[in-house]
């Protein structure tokens, strides 16, 4: 029997704190107090983007935010998340 490795855990470090999330549920990033990862910045929507493990990789998906999600100056609706 072949066992598959567990999906990688997503760890987010922000403002001196650290949170880890397992695959299987969506992680909401935004300025709302109930967001999984809260960023209290007026340029960030209440539920700005969703982090999701899909097809073997973690993705950051813009959630229809007013200001959009940018990477290196380009507006990106979906971004692959890579380990640093």
Mark where each language-model region is.
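Forkhead-associated
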Residues: 26, 37, 47-84
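Intrinsically disordered, low-complexity acidic Ser/Thr-rich regulatory segments
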Residues: 1-42, 52
């Amino acid at each position: 029997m072949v066992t598959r490795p567990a999906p990688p855990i997503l760890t987010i470090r922000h403002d001196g704190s650290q949170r880890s999330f397992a695959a299987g549920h969506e992680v909401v990033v935004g300025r709302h107090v109930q967001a999984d990862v809260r960023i209290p910045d007026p340029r960030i929507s209440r539920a700005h983007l969703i982090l999701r493990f899909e097809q073997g990789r973690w993705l950051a998906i813009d959630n229809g935010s007013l200001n959009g999600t940018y990477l290196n100056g380009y507006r990106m609706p979906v971004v692959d998340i890579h380990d640093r």
